[in-house]
Amino acid sequence: MEYAIKEIARVIGAKTNQLLDDTVSLLLTDSRRLSFPEKSLFFALKTKTNDGHRYIQELYKLRVRNFVVSDMLPEFESMKDANFLIVKDTLRALQKLATHHRKQFNIPVIGITGSNGKTIVKEFPYQLLHNEFNIVRSPDRKSVV
C-alpha cells in the first residue's frame, strides 16, 4: 500500500522543511535492512544505545529521500531533494502511522504474546484456515512488533 508523504505528515503531525511530492510503501527503522530506497520512509529512532539520525547521510547516499526525524541537524540542510518530517518523538510518530494504517482495514486482530511459541501459534491457524479465509499475518518470525 502506498501513502503520499503529505498524508503521512498530516497523520503524524509533522512539521516539514519542505514537502516534495512523493509516495512511500516501505517503512524503515534499521538502515541495514534497506531494499527499495526510492519507496522507503526512514524513521530515525533514538534508543539508549543508538540514534537513527546518525544513519541519515548514509541512507541519503543510497537514494533514500524520505525521513522522519526529531532533530533537524545542520548536515541535513544540503539534502534539498529530501523530505524531512520533523516530530517530537519518532517512535510515537511510527506508532501513529501504524495505527492509521491498521484503521484502513475492517478485519479482526489477534495478538499473540509470551516468551515462547509465538511463531508456531501464528502459523498453525494460518495453515488450517488460509484456503477458506482471507488471512493476513506478519512475515517470518516478526510476530512481535
Indicate residue ranges for each PLM-predicted region:
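N-terminal leader/targeting and accessory segments in enzymes
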Residues: M1-K96
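Phosphate-binding loop of NTP-binding sites
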Residues: A9-I12, R92-V145
